[in-house]
Amino acid sequence: MFLLYEYDIFWAFLIISSLIPILAFFISGILAPIRKGPEKLSSYESGIEPMGDAWFQFRIRYYMFALVFVVFDVETVFLYPWAMSFDVLGLSVFLEAFVFVLILIVGLVYAWRKGALEWS
């Protein structure tokens, strides 16, 4: 029971930092005007009247390419601390990292065969 006294500041900070955004959204919802005129519903293109339809579809290839990039970018974030402390951690952590990289290589080969890396 006495060990919980060390976390009083943490809990107070957590409660206050949770209440501030909730109160901000609540107060802005009360004070904000709710009129939706034609200007509010029109598309905005850098201060110029929109020409044509403002909504158009992107090709799924862009999303797939970005998704593969994010996966391998996160992989580097996970592998960097491991590489910096490789000499301290030992063989078991090396094997775990090897399995991690192997799974990612299998994913890369799968994405390659499905054509997710083809740009044309």
UniProtKB/Swiss-Prot annotation:
Transmembrane segments: 9-29, 64-84, 88-108
Catalytic activity: a plastoquinone + NADH + (n+1) H(+)(in) = a plastoquinol + NAD(+) + n H(+)(out); a plastoquinone + NADPH + (n+1) H(+)(in) = a plastoquinol + NADP(+) + n H(+)(out)
Taxonomic superkingdom: Eukaryota
GO cellular component terms listed in the entry, alphabetical order: chloroplast thylakoid membrane; NADH dehydrogenase complex
EC number(s) on file: 7.1.1.-
Keywords: Chloroplast, Membrane, NAD, NADP, Plastid, Plastoquinone, Quinone, Thylakoid, Translocase, Transmembrane, Transmembrane helix, Transport
Topology of this chain in the membrane: Multi-pass membrane protein
Annotated compartments: Plastid, Chloroplast thylakoid membrane
GO biological process, one term: photosynthesis, light reaction
MF annotations from Gene Ontology: NADH dehydrogenase (ubiquinone) activity; quinone binding
InterPro entries given in the database record: NAD(P)H_OxRDtase_bac/plastid (IPR023043), NADH_UbQ/plastoQ_OxRdtase_su3 (IPR000440), NDAH_ubi_oxred_su3_sf (IPR038430)
Keyword Glycosyltransferase included in the entry's annotation: no
A Pfam family assignment: Oxidored_q4
Family: Belongs to the complex I subunit 3 family.
Subunit structure as annotated in this protein's UniProt entry: NDH is composed of at least 16 different subunits, 5 of which are encoded in the nucleus.
Function: NDH shuttles electrons from NAD(P)H:plastoquinone, via FMN and iron-sulfur (Fe-S) centers, to quinones in the photosynthetic chain and possibly in a chloroplast respiratory chain. The immediate electron acceptor for the enzyme in this species is believed to be plastoquinone. Couples the redox reaction to proton translocation, and thus conserves the redox energy in a proton gradient.
Listed PANTHER family: NADH-UBIQUINONE OXIDOREDUCTASE CHAIN 3
Entry protein name: NAD(P)H-quinone oxidoreductase subunit 3, chloroplastic
